Amino acid sequence: MKLHWQKQSSETTRLLLIFSGWSVDWHLFARYDYPAGYDVAVVWDYTVLSNDIFADLRDYDETVVIAWSFGVASFNVLHQSLPSRLNLNCAIAVNGTISPVDDNFGIPENIFSATLSGLSDVSLKGFQRRICGGGNRYKDFKDDLTLCRDDITSLKNQLETFSPEKHRVETWKTAEDKRLWDRAFISTGDLIFPPDNMKNAWNCIGTPIISAEGSHLPDFQHIIDTVVRDKSLIGQQFNSSNKTYEKHAEVQIHAARQLMALWRSATAPAQVLEIGPGSGTLSREIATRYPEAKLTWIDLAETSPSGCNGTFLHGDAEIIVKQLPNEYFDAIFSANSVQWFHSPMRFLINAAKLLKKGGKIALSTFAPGTLNEITEINGGTSLPYLSDNEWQHFAKTAGFETEKIKEEKSVLKFTSGRGLADHLKKTGVNALTKSPRKDNFALMRNLMSRGECTLTFNPLYIILKKQ
């Protein structure tokens, strides 16, 4: 195995670790933009799978893994020996499976065998054209792929590592498999891994699938922008919108109040944790209903909720929840926040540890279809919202019983595109994009050209009980 740093600074606290595919090294990934606050390293050449390559890595608050092609199966083997100091918090699979050569779950065995036996300089070039989806796109990546090229003997040895007799996975439904992978991206035009086989593989363990047009070599920039959260940017955007949030975020305010209306508890919780309190809409609802409860808040924004007394912890909730005492809280609340997390699944697993037996967690988030107007912009990036079924799967994996799950739909109408863009700014909803002004301008221009000014929200309410 080999590792190359694409980006590294002693001041960063997060790591993006990319497991590349066969015959492709770090050169391919030099073209992409990466979010601030992350070191970025690329791993390739899985002839010998060993965690020795990670021995010199320093401590990180959080590590996000994007594994592509044969890198998926490789990381699936390596993750159990990944140093704990890296704090793995998200694993994304891209056009690959944990059983890479399999007639039902990966590359069919006869195709793999033919590729291996016929490997040559000529066939390798043909393979590279296929991963690009054809000659036109291959032209865009030809120079990078040429730089990646290793000698044929070495590439053959690397490929033999994945032969069925050496790398077959039978334990598809183990708890460990279900707790590792957060999402799987599948390109519908993949000419290497059959898309239907990939769907079979990920459906077996309940991993949420995101399907998109494209080839085996996907739009990595879009994937990076979609799944890797720039937490500092999110915090800045919500800090700047804090004073205007309650006046303009009518959908989010309704969702927070509706969540409390759905909450039922036989006894008043003594210790309550709220994640992402923002301006304090839900916080005040909790304090009014349970005036004796001791409240703890975690938020990326720097200001504690107004009108309430409690303990405020400033920072990333996905990191801080790992540092709080187990079985300490009676209830956990979060309104309109968990969609910003890298891993809602791991959050639920950690939340279950914090709750006493029988404790409950109440979440409001958003379902697929939310802000679909933004995703229609050229180059627009939206959050990969989870469906109610995906949330229920993650809840069961984490040890929760689903007490209530309810979805609504709300469409906001604006008299002008400028008003819509202003709404995004004043509510912090545009916190995912790196260039909010540019993205808002594109959104305004797009909607005005169609004569429409709407934003769609699908609030999702979830109440879970620890078993």
List each model region and its residues.
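Class I SAM-dependent methyltransferase Rossmann-like catalytic core
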Residues: 228-258, 263
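A short glycine-rich, Lys/Arg-flanked "PGG" loop and its adjoining helix->strand segment in the class I
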Residues: 345-360
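Flexible "cap/lid" loop of the alpha/beta hydrolase fold
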Residues: 87-118, 380
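Conserved Class I S-adenosyl-L-methionine
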Residues: 143-166, 174-178, 212-221, 404-467
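A short acidic, Gly/Pro-enriched loop at the edge of an enzyme's catalytic core
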Residues: 322-332
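Conserved class I S-adenosyl-L-methionine
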Residues: 362-386
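Class I SAM-dependent methyltransferase SAM/SAH-binding core
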Residues: 273-321
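Short beta-strand/loop motif that positions the catalytic acidic residue
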Residues: 184-186
